[in-house]
C-alpha cells in the first residue's frame, strides 16, 4: 500500500515515510490531507474561523531559547500594548468578521491576575461575540503564582472574567 492510501485510510506511516513527507510537493500533501479528511467526514464540508492573534507584549521573564518574539537586549525592542490598544485591535477584528481573539504575551513582570481579569471583562463587555482563546498555560501559572493561589482557582477566575478557552 502506498503512503497516500495509508493516510487516506487512517493507517500508520513508518518513520521513513513520515520523513519522506518533508520532501513531498505541497499540493500532494494537501491532496493527501484532503483525502484523509474526506474519509473522516464524507460530507465534503470544511470550515474556518477568522481569528485575531494579539501579542500584548514581548517583555517576558522566562526568556525561553525557542521563543522568536521576546525582547532581547540590543536585538529586539520591548513593547507592551495598552488595554485601549488591545480593545482597538478587538474592534478591528470584529469589523473584519473576526469571531475569536487569541491573546498571549509571556510572563510580563508587571502583569498579574487582576490585570488579566480586568482586561478580559473590558473585552467581553465591548465585544461579547468574541470567543476569547487567551493566555498560555505558562502565563496562567505565572498569574496563579503571582496571586498566591492554586492554578485551578486562577483558571476559574479567568473563566469568570470572560476567558472561553486556553491555547496550547
What are these regions (language model features)?
Residues 1-61:
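Flexible, acidic/Gly-rich N-terminal and inter-domain linker regions that tether
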Residues 16, 24, 29, 57-59, ...:
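Surface-exposed loop/turn and secondary-structure junction residues enriched for glycine/proline
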Residues 31-35, 59-68, 149-154:
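Short, charged low-complexity intrinsically disordered segments located at boundaries
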Residues 40-95, 166:
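Active-site cofactor/substrate anionic-group-binding motifs, chiefly glycine-
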Amino acid at each position: 500500500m502506498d503512503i497516500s492510501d495509508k493516510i487516506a485510510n487512517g493507517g500508520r506511516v513508518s518513520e521513513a515515510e513520515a520523513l519522506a513527507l518533508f520532501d513531498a510537493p505541497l499540493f500532494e500533501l494537501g491532496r493527501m490531507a484532503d483525502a484523509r479528511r474526506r474519509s473522516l467526514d464524507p460530507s465534503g464540508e470544511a470550515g474556518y474561523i477568522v481569528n485575531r492573534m494579539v501579542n500584548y507584549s514581548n517583555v517576558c521573564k522566562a526568556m525561553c531559547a525557542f521563543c522568536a518574539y521576546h525582547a532581547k537586549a540590543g536585538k529586539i525592542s520591548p513593547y507592551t500594548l495598552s488595554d485601549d490598544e488591545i480593545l482597538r485591535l478587538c474592534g478591528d477584528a470584529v469589523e473584519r468578521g473576526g469571531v475569536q481573539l487569541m491573546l498571549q504575551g509571556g510572563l510580563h513582570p508587571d502583569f498579574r491576575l487582576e490585570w488579566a481579569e480586568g482586561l478580559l471583562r473590558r473585552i467581553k463587555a465591548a465585544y461579547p461575540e468574541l470567543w476569547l482563546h487567551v493566555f498560555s498555560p505558562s502565563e496562567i501559572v505565572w498569574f496563579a503564582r503571582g496571586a498566591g493561589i492554586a492554578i485551578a482557582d486562577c483558571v476559574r477566575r479567568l473563566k469568570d472574567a470572560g476567558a472561553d478557552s486556553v491555547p496550547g
